[in-house]
């Protein structure tokens, strides 16, 4: 929000707390906002930068319809802002339920070259086919557009960790390779959502193969309430003609 504040730490996982007393944003959301602002301020946002000053002419798709980043982007961007959730696998991308749009990042309904920024926080690990999601993001982004997101990320290994796969012959249609792991999910507060993958630098190679110019950002800024050693944000651009990182 960019306002003077106090950050509250309520449990040891700094990535999921360090809560702003004003806007209720958490550490991980501010990491994404910081990288978004860095891209419009030539690499380093000024101390007073806030997401409420993001350019209104940019089409931004956020894969979340709750929490502080959504609230700020919706208030700022208006009609150019798109927010969605993964609601039900039986729904088609673009369908709505209770006023919320359902979109499967692995199979979206958006037109080619139609979006400037795609942002999401800890979403990709819940998709059984993340490589399809990477291809879809590249397809719908405009040349020069970017996807900025967080995922659980290993720094001690190169390859992604496959924890579960879709298998019609398995109980529940999912075969678990490693012990089941679930994350909290505002859409499914009782059940949570299954983790299919935990990522590693291999993800950036997969994004390069899809055509992206990706970079791994390590974000740390006590001034912005971005604490801890796990401030990892992926920032990947769909290059315009002649564009480089």
Task: Outline where the language-model segments fall.
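A short acidic, Gly/Pro-enriched loop at the edge of an enzyme's catalytic core
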Residues: 103-118
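Glycine/Thr-rich phosphate-binding loops of Rossmann-like dinucleotide-binding domains
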Residues: 70, 128, 157
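Active-site micro-motifs of SAM-dependent methyltransferase domains
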Residues: 107, 125, 155
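Conserved N-terminal segment of class I S-adenosyl-L-methionine
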Residues: 1-107, 164-168, 222-245
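Residues that mark the start of a beta-strand
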Residues: 57-60, 114, 142
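A short SAM/SAH-binding and catalytic strip from SAM-dependent methyltransferases
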Residues: 116-128
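S-adenosyl-L-methionine-dependent methyltransferase catalytic module, highlighting the catalytic core
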Residues: 131-244
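GHKL-family ATP-binding catalytic core of two-component histidine kinases
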Residues: 109-111, 128, 200
């Amino acid at each position: 929000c960019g306002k003077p504040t106090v950050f509250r730490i309520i449990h040891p996982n700094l990535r999921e707390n360090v809560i702003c007393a004003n806007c209720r944003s958490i550490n991980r959301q501010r990491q994404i906002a910081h990288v978004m602002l860095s891209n419009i301020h030539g690499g380093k946002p000024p101390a007073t930068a806030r997401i409420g000053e993001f350019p209104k002419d940019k089409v931004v798709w956020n894969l979340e319809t709750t929490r502080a980043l959504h609230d700020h982007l919706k208030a700022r961007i208006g009609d150019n802002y798109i927010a969605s959730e993964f609601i039900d696998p039986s729904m088609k991308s673009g369908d709505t339920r209770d006023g919320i749009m359902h979109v499967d990042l692995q199979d979206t309904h958006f037109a080619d070259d139609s979006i400037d920024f795609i942002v999401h926080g800890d979403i990709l690990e819940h998709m059984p086919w993340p490589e399809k999601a990477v291809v879809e993001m590249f397809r719908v982004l405009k040349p020069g557009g970017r996807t900025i997101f967080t995922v659980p990320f290993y720094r001690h290994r190169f390859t992604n960790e496959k924890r579960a796969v879709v298998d019609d012959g398995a109980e529940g249609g999912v075969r678990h390779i490693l012990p089941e792991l679930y994350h909290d999910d505002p859409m499914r507060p009782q059940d949570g959502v299954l983790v299919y993958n935990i990522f590693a630098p291999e993800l950036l190679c997969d994004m390069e193969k899809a055509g992206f110019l990706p970079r791994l950002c390590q974000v740390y800024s006590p001034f912005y309430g971005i604490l801890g050693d796990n401030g990892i944000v992926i920032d990947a651009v769909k290059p315009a003609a002649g564009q480089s990182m």
